[in-house]
Structures are given as C-alpha cells and as structure tokens.
Amino acid sequence: APALIVYEWSLKGLGKVGWLAAFIYCSAAALRLARFNTNIGIVDKRFFQGMPSPAAAALVIGFVWVMDDAGYEGVFTIPALAWAALAITLYAGLTMVTNVPFYSFKDVNFRRSVPFIVIVAIALAIAVINIHAPIVLFALFCVYGLSGYVVYGWRRAKGLRTSLIATSKDEPEEEGLHR
C-alpha cells in the first residue's frame, strides 16, 4: 500500500522512473518478509536485519503526510517533491533488504516495574507529538530510518561484528545470538 499511495501522490509524474521506484519498494518488501520468515532463530533478536517493513512504510507515508499537511496536493506536478518522494521510496525499499541492523525493541520488558522517569518521558513524548503530529512523527521515522546505519558504522568503527546472522551455535563470537 505505501508504494501505491506514494506512486499516486507523486511518482506517477516521473513516468517509468516513478513506476520503477514503486516496483522496487514492493519487491523489497516481499523479499524482506521472506527473509524475516526464514531467518527466525538465526538472527540476533535484539535487531532486525534491514529496516522492518512497517518502519519503511512509516517513512514513506510519513513524508506524504507531512507534505499533504503542508498543503501540497498532486505533487507529481512539482518536480522537487516528486524527486524527494522517489529518493525516500528507494531508500526505504533498498534499506529493507540490506544487512544493516535496526533495533527491534524486543528486549524491552514492560512487565517489570518502570522507573518514574520513564513514565515522565512517555508523557513528555506524547505532549511533543501533540504539538504537530505529522512533523514530529516523520522526524522520529527518519531518526529510526537512519539509526541502523549509525549502529552499523559504530560497530564497524569499533571492530565489532556487523552481521546479525549466526551460522553456528558453537562459535564463541556468536554467543547470545540464539536466545
């Protein structure tokens, strides 16, 4: 659905290039889902391998939401916005099929007691989102969309392993990946 929405909103004005970007996004989402289903149990559960498809959809649709909220309708007639939509669509699509680690939040435990500061932070986050939801949420989507590359670069600079795939339960450097 995100590829169809962004195509109708802006990419169709770019002709075959816009169609190709939407197709790449759809194909990448299908490959991402297939890889997610086959890698269960061999990938570190704290991270996703590549951007998860809901996050990619949020990134693409978040851009459409922000631009629509700003009053831009039928932007396939505005080349700069159409090309920006193309870049975001391709980025989201291709990032879904990379091996870049994206934090999954699966190790967050909401059943144990939560410190008071966390409750205050959640209330503050809700207040900030209510200031102007489209811009704040799109900014959060962008931060998450870039976070995987930041983690990848940091791990690579520190000399840590960047692959999330465990090939053996017996190798010491893969300890903890099969939880």
Stretch-by-stretch model annotation:
Residues A1-L33:
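Multi-pass membrane catalytic core of lipid/isoprenoid biosynthesis enzymes
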Residues K12, W19, I40, A82-W83, ...:
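Generic hydrophobic-segment detector
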Residues A22-I61:
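Hydrophobic, well-structured mid-protein blocks that either form specific transmembrane helices
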Residues K45-R179:
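C-terminal membrane-associated helical module and adjoining short loops/tails
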